[in-house]
């Protein structure tokens, strides 16, 4: 099983004139690796995976895998609210050379705990590929609780969980039920990386790493080494920047920020709309105060 730990980036999908900008994506991936990022996570929430076609997702994953060349893990977004589509997505990630697949809980149709269990076990049985479950109830309208996660872990259906509830009690419950190192525990909230790691987490799948990869890597390293004084200093320093990444629906603000760095365009795919001028101003000001060099 790949070592799912450290600072991973939920990488944006650059777009130009309505199409995926593979050149910019390759350059972003190379920059992330040069800055010390441990894993690249394409086609997730931040990568607008839900509005990419299957062919586009394949293009994105292939490009990231080709650039990474084993220098960073690739955990490819492959979820769907239809189990048969999620299976095909995971099969594609496997065939394209990803190290694991990130599979969000089924959104909109609100499955029961039993439905969630059957969803992930069906994926595992059909693919035999490492799956990181992704629990983000604010996006999906379903919360996969600790009992279901533990049941899946014990069945071998998942190798990790990206937990985006910002609940430390939830993380402690997961460790209590599953064990500290039985699966990978990855934070899905940049705001809570320090306490999450203190509660047994192994790392983060980060939005802010798209614009400040070295800072997030330093924070994760400090926390994992137990230097919580330094880690907290870094977390506090990043707080304003973290907040403005969600001043409007993500990934709008972070794509705007990537554009302000001159690394890719800010284009989003509908129904997401460009951030307002007021929000863009807040993003620019926070980046400047943080010390990022704008293009």
Swiss-Prot record:
Pfam families: DHDPS (PF00701). Its EC number is 4.3.3.7. The record marks 45, 108 as: Part of a proton relay during catalysis. Transmembrane segments: none annotated. SUPFAM superfamilies: Aldolase. GO terms for cellular component: cytosol. It catalyses: L-aspartate 4-semialdehyde + pyruvate = (2S,4S)-4-hydroxy-2,3,4,5-tetrahydrodipicolinate + H2O + H(+). The active site is at residues 134, 162. Pyruvate binds at residues 46, 205. CDD domains: DHDPS. It is an enzyme of class 4 (lyase). The keyword NADP does not apply. One of its GO terms (biological process) is lysine biosynthetic process via diaminopimelate. Pathway: Amino-acid biosynthesis; L-lysine biosynthesis via DAP pathway; (S)-tetrahydrodipicolinate from L-aspartate: step 3/4. It is found in: Cytoplasm. The keyword Lyase applies. GO terms for molecular function: 4-hydroxy-tetrahydrodipicolinate synthase activity. Its main location: cytoplasm. Keywords: Amino-acid biosynthesis, Cytoplasm, Diaminopimelate biosynthesis, Lyase, Lysine biosynthesis, Schiff base. Catalyzes the condensation of (S)-aspartate-beta-semialdehyde [(S)-ASA] and pyruvate to 4-hydroxy-tetrahydrodipicolinate (HTPA). Belongs to the DapA family. Homotetramer; dimer of dimers. NCBIfam families: dapA. This is 4-hydroxy-tetrahydrodipicolinate synthase. The gene is dapA.
């Amino acid at each position: 099983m790949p070592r799912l730990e450290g600072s991973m980036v939920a990488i944006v999908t650059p777009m130009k004139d309505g199409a995926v900008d593979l050149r910019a994506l390759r350059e972003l991936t190379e920059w992330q690796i040069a800055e010390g990022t441990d894993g690249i996570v394409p086609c997730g929430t931040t990568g607008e995976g839900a509005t990419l076609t299957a062919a586009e997702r394949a293009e994105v994953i292939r490009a990231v895998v080709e650039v990474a060349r084993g220098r960073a893990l690739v955990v490819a977004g492959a979820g769907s609210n239809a189990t048969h589509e999620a299976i095909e997505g995971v099969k594609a990630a496997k065939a394209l050379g990803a190290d694991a697949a990130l599979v969000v809980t089924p959104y909109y149709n609100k499955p029961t705990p039993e439905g969630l269990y059957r969803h992930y076990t069906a994926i595992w049985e059909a693919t035999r590929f490492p799956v990181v479950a992704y629990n983000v109830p604010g996006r999906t309208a379903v919360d996969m609780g600790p009992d279901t996660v533990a049941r899946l872990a014990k069945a071998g259906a998942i190798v990790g969980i990206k937990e985006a509830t910002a609940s430390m009690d939830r993380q402690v419950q997961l460790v209590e039920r599953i064990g500290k190192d039985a699966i990978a525990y990855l934070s899905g909230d940049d705001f809570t990386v320090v306490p999450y790691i203190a509660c047994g987490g192994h790392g983060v799948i980060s939005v802010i790493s798209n614009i400040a990869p070295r800072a997030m890597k330093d924070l994760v390293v400090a926390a994992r080494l137990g230097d919580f004084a330094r880690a907290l200093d870094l977390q506090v320093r990043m707080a304003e920047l973290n907040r403005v990444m969600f001043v409007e629906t993500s990934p709008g603000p972070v794509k705007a920020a990537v554009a302000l760095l001159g690394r890719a365009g800010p284009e989003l795919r509908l129904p997401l709309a460009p951030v307002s001028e007021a929000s863009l101003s807040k993003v620019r000001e926070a980046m400047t105060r943080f010390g990022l060099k704008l293009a």
